[in-house]
């Protein structure tokens, strides 16, 4: 069975708790995706604007992005097949992988009002 989990606070919770994308206490993780026969996990970078009102959102965004990239690299090094969905071609290929993730940035606090930051995040 293929499950798509759009519960987007996963990445934030992993960062705060220091837990892994592979096995955690959130609604869904990579381990459960594989056990169920496949899945897609949305991982949103959400900047709580009440904490980062005027600045700091970009730095927090980069911290979450770093956590995400490290988690994917660790899974890859262990030989675990996780597809990061980065393109339309990747999206079409999701069903051919045991697990997949889709990274998203939720709301504008992530860029601290900078279009340059937005362009650079897109490149990452």
Language-model features: locations:
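N-terminal hydrophobic targeting/anchoring segments and the immediately downstream early-domain regions
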Residues: 1-123
């Amino acid at each position: 069975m293929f499950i798509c989990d759009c519960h987007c606070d996963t990445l934030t919770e992993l960062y705060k708790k220091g837990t892994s994308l592979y096995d955690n206490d959130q609604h869904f993780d990579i381990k459960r995706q594989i056990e169920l026969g496949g899945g897609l996990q949305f991982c949103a970078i959400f900047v709580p604007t009440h904490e980062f009102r005027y600045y700091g959102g970009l730095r927090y965004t980069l911290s979450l992005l770093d956590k995400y990239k490290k988690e994917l690299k660790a899974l890859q090094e262990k030989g675990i097949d996780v597809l990061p969905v980065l393109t339309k071609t990747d999206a079409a290929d999701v069903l051919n992988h045991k697990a997949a993730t889709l990274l998203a940035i939720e709301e504008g606090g992530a860029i601290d009002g900078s279009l340059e930051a937005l362009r650079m995040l897109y490149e990452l």
